[in-house]
Amino acid sequence: MDILTCALALLSGVIGAGFASGREIDRFFAGHGAMSGAAILCALLTLHALFVRLPAQLERAGVSSLSGLCRVRFGRAMGLALTVLFILLSAITGGAMLSACAELGALVLPMRHAYGLCMGFTLALGAVLAFLGIPGLAAAGAGLCALLPMLLLRLLSLPAGEACFLPAMTPDLPVRACVDGAAYGALNAAMLAGALPMLLTLKPGRRRKASLLFCALFGALLLLGTLVCRHHRQAIALMPLPFVYLSRALGAGGYTLVALCMYAAALSTLCTMLCALARYLPLPRPTGLALGAVACLLFAMIGFGRIVQSGYPVLGALCAALMLLLCLPLPTSSFAPQEASQSSR
């Protein structure tokens, strides 16, 4: 049961509004045509490798948080600076997801002040789920596993739409598809970096099984979403939100379903970011969650579009590169003092 719970908790962090809207799937996977399978495989391999390697690094360094590993790897001052980067990534991502939930509420709910009310409700709900820890994240992941297949299967059953033109595209090389898949996996793992210490509750063998189960669940959703985008390739060309566009054919019920999927995806990512912020901050968990919620709220005031179109992608890429560095073998001198102090006790 703990393996399934951890796998669902991981799933809740990697599926955000961009995934549920189809934008990320079309950009990183379906756009590669016949090579989309290679992109999916590389993304899953990258996620699995990082999810197994990083907790092992934490155990080897004798620390229980990413900030501690940064200090061991890069020294106190540089470790603190890098931890601030991961804190910024979590707060900005949480703010973007909170803003997305509020915008969805304003679009769906026929009431005044729907934006502000939905933002407040979402932040409170996200804080409660984050306070529950792994069970709260797993509940959000289970909700996504129930909602997304319903949406994707309904979209896949629609007849292929027609377009007035077929976009001219040269065949993609396997290398480009693999690079896109690996980059997607690394970016998502970087956003989950602060929550990955939850895997330390499992022994290495069970940790590997939890990661494999996560890859199976996430891979199935990725494959299903890619099939939808490829099936409707002509109709969704140049569409910023492919699944939202396709849901028009499903009527009001389809529009509500895709909005619910996007809300659940954004909420689950918000919960994961709040958990990560609580782990990054050297404060009691309730205080860390409260400060994390305030940080997400401040960034949400900027608006989803401005956040995504600003330096957010660059920050994500930088944190992904730093995470890869953290997975490199630790020099013996980095953790010998910790082991010596522990043995003296």
Where are the predicted features?
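Hydrophobic, small-residue-rich membrane helices and short re-entrant helix-turn-helix hairpins
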Residues: G22-A30, S65, F131-A142, A195-L217
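Membrane-interface interhelical connector segments
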Residues: C229-A252
